[in-house]
UniProtKB/Swiss-Prot annotation:
Effect of L184P: In DYT11; affects protein stability; the mutant undergoes endoplasmic reticulum-associated degradation
One GO CC term on file: Golgi apparatus
Segments in the Extracellular topological domain: 1-317
Name by which UniProt lists this protein: Epsilon-sarcoglycan
Taxonomic source organism: Homo sapiens
Location of this chain's protein in the cell: Cell membrane, Sarcolemma; Cytoplasm, Cytoskeleton; Cell projection, Dendrite; Golgi apparatus
Keyword annotations from UniProtKB, A to Z: Cell membrane, Cell projection, Cytoplasm, Cytoskeleton, Disease variant, Dystonia, Glycoprotein, Golgi apparatus, Membrane, Transmembrane, Transmembrane helix, Ubl conjugation
Tissues and organs where the protein is expressed, per its UniProt entry: Ubiquitous.
Length: 437
């Protein structure tokens, strides 16, 4: 382990000597040196013991200042460092923490918090939590053990338990001792119990809540369960009356007379309050009838033989292929009969059609064919609206028409087409006689 150099521990003027090898430290410097060495070794090798009670909220803060002195180079007395530090916590010998213990740390520049409600099953059993601190700037690590000795609590569990949902708090804010103390004080003024304990604190995100938007300083919300030894007060019972239940179903705030005692610091959602009376709960535990511990005789065990009997799969193979093939063949024959043998044919259709209808349709088809042939052979000018920028026959570029030089109101529609150069002329119809295409 790297220790501070001796001339950095005190004032150089405090050293005296009569020559080389005869230097002495003053009493003040000696005390500072021993205190520094003791603090370094005690922080690295010491374990902390805590004694929470079963069924009572346990909170342990992992202070960054406590671990800063464990990362080399060790700071001098009075030196301030603000390195980012994160923590990893797990049960000794296991990759994670016990089920009742939670951990939260918002940023590497804030303290971590271990919190939870110890269970009665772990009473008398020391729970060793390994805490590993990581310095994100120097990549140094430091390890510390937290020994949790769970003690049995009196009157565990408390018979009357109430769970409140506080909308304007995050879980790490609620875990602060002064904030939690203020909330318990407000509950005590409303409930008036002789014994009041915080049982558990749960973030709303762990109950399926949504992450709030980063606007208007919105909070996640936190559930706080408290227990007392006296029945619920009339103020807490007001949530159960029909009027308030109806308002909650309509997403309206219920009318609670004691809400003003919390409103100064805590915004409570009274529609989500839960009141549990342990004295009225029916126990579903059934007494276990212990027997002799001997299983009933099921006869002699006969394991299967080593040599398995061979099985012929030829019949199964034929059935698997023959049945689908036969069905497919029948369907094919039915389809072939319908397509080939049940067709009318053109001759049968013409025989059943009257002659005048056949002549009418044949004339229409003949006229249609003649029109198509004529449309292929005719040579007429294209309309101006479809003229390209070049001539469709010669490929020469046609100059654009400037309509400003002409009086478009008096100009015939076909005059422009007749005056265009290289324009194909429309054949004129003869005035005398008949003309056939």
């Amino acid at each position: 382990m790297q220790l501070p150099r001796w001339w950095e521990l005190g004032d150089p003027c405090a050293w005296t000597g009569q020559g080389r090898g005869t230097r002495r430290m003053s009493p003040a410097t000696t005390g500072t040196f021993l205190l520094t060495v003791y603090s370094i070794f005690s922080k690295v090798h010491s374990d902390r013991n805590v004694y929470p009670s079963a069924g009572v909220l346990f909170v342990h803060v992992l202070e960054r200042e406590y671990f800063k002195g464990e990362f080399p180079p060790y700071p001098k007395p009075g030196e301030i460092s603000n390195d980012p530090i994160t923590f990893n916590t797990n049960l000794m010998g296991y990759p994670d923490r016990p089920g009742w213990l939670r951990y939260i740390q918002r940023t590497p520049y804030s303290d971590g918090v271990l919190y939870g409600s110890p269970t009665a099953e772990n009473v008398g059993k020391p729970t060793i939590i390994e805490i590993t601190a990581y310095n994100r700037r120097t990549f140094e690590t430091a390890r510390h053990n937290l020994i949790i000795n769970i003690m049995s609590a009196e009157d565990f569990p408390l018979p009357y338990q109430a769970e409140f949902f506080i909308k304007n708090m995050n879980v790490e804010e609620m875990l602060a001792s002064e904030v939690l103390g203020d909330f318990l004080g407000a509950v005590k003024n409303v409930w008036q119990p002789e014994r009041l304990n915080a049982i558990n604190i749960t973030s709303a995100l762990d109950r399926g809540g949504r992450v709030p938007l980063p606007i208007n300083d919105l909070k996640e919300g936190v559930y706080v369960m408290v227990g007392a030894d006296v029945p619920f007060s009339s103020c807490l019972r007001e949530v159960e009356n029909p009027q308030n239940q109806l308002r909650c179903s309509q997403e309206m705030e219920p009318v609670i007379t004691c809400d003003k005692k919390f409103r100064t610091q805590f915004y409570i959602d009274w529609c989500k309050i839960s009141l549990v009376d342990k004295t009225k709960q029916v126990s579903t535990y059934q007494e276990v009838i212990r027997g002799e511990g001997i299983l009933p005789d099921g006869g002699e065990y006969k394991p299967p033989s080593d040599s398995l009997k061979s099985r012929d799969y030829y019949t199964d193979f034929l059935i698997t292929l023959a049945v689908p093939s036969a069905v497919a063949l029948v369907l094919f024959l039915i389809l072939a009969y319908i397509m080939c043998c049940r067709r009318e044919g053109v001759e049968k259709r013409n025989m059943q059609t009257p002659d005048i209808q056949l002549v009418h349709h044949s004339a229409i088809q003949k006229s249609t064919k003649e029109l198509r042939d004529m449309s292929k052979n005719r040579e007429i000018a294209w309309p101006l609206s479809t003229l390209p920028v070049f001539h469709p026959v010669t490929g020469e570029i046609i100059p654009p028409l400037h309509t400003d030089n002409y009086d478009s109101t008096n100009m015939p529609l076909m005059q422009t087409q007749q005056n265009l150069p290289h324009q194909t002329q429309i054949p004129q119809q003869q005035t005398t006689g008949k003309w056939y295409p």
